Curated annotation (Swiss-Prot):
Domain of life of the native organism: Bacteria
Binding sites annotated in the UniProt record for [4Fe-4S] cluster: 262, 265, 297, 304
Cofactor(s) needed: [4Fe-4S] cluster
Native organism: Helicobacter hepaticus (strain ATCC 51449 / 3B1)
Reactions catalysed according to its record: (2E)-4-hydroxy-3-methylbut-2-enyl diphosphate + oxidized [flavodoxin] + H2O + 2 H(+) = 2-C-methyl-D-erythritol 2,4-cyclic diphosphate + reduced [flavodoxin]
The protein, known as: 4-hydroxy-3-methylbut-2-en-1-yl diphosphate synthase (flavodoxin)
Record bears the keyword 4Fe-4S: yes
Amino acid sequence: MQRVKTKQIFVGNVAVGGDAPISVQSMTFSKTCDIEATKAQLDRLYFAGADMVRVAVSDPKDADALKDLKKVSPLPLIADIHFRYKFALIAAESVDCIRINPGNIGSKDRIKAVADACNARGIPIRIGVNGGSLEKQFEEKYGATPKGMVESALYNIKLLEDFGFSNIKISLKASDVLRTMEAYRMLRPLVDYPFHLGVTEAGTLPHSMIKSAMALGGLLMEGIGDTMRISITGELEEEIKVARLILQYSGRQKSGVSIVSCPTCGRIEANLVKMVQEVESRIKHIKIPLQVSVMGCAVNALGEAKHADIAIAFGNKDGLIIKEGKILCKLKEDQLLERFITEVEELAKQREEV
């Protein structure tokens, strides 16, 4: 399905919305005022492939540290503000975007002050609606439902627009798949602002992967979404890896290696799990789109190879390498993997030069 066209904004030098690629972001977990620790996490996310990063602003020390942190950050910075609107006013002097939670930021006057500060610097505001912290009037009327989340978003969008502010992106996050998807679907036809996708508090890696693949992958395939964060109780790099995979398999990102590998069965002669893990590890740096097939026997290998750019099929102490649908060579198992990696890298290089 064609992607929904939205208004384009900029977070630092990263375009969000319009025809810009769907960007990936994460959030540091260090105390933001600890410049050294936070810079180390920013660097990790940069090398993992993040496009922008959010940092928590929980106290005055965090707010005051943003100016120095911005100087050393390799990525655009988003300040995450809850409760204390004055921290947003300080943050607006340094960062590339402000996230506010309508459920706890406070009165209209406070929101206007934040809007004025962001307008002065030309930076966007994310209206970050969370199903677990809706404003009292929406919680009492609708409960923590998609309708309540959408009404909160619409109310705060109108507030900002009334204050002369339209440099906006929106998120509608719940901790479960169905509420998240329904909220985004309900709001999408009503506004043209870019959407930040996410499932909040999604859990550890396996739980978050499944929730995020279902919710975000589903929305992306419907054409909804302009930037995204995968929320994982775990390592920073995993958030970026999972996000990129969801973008790839939803058809919204045409880059990187897509690996097809068979499940294990009684026909397999080689240690397929180990082989697939090694292939993944050694070709993960490749950015050119490639379809790579790793098969444990000949039953489906030739059929899969027709759809792959390059394939390997393990047999009884030997195997085949099949490149662009043709058998390239048959080698002993101890020679097979190294030759395959070489051929994959060579094919990627050839495609890159075209």
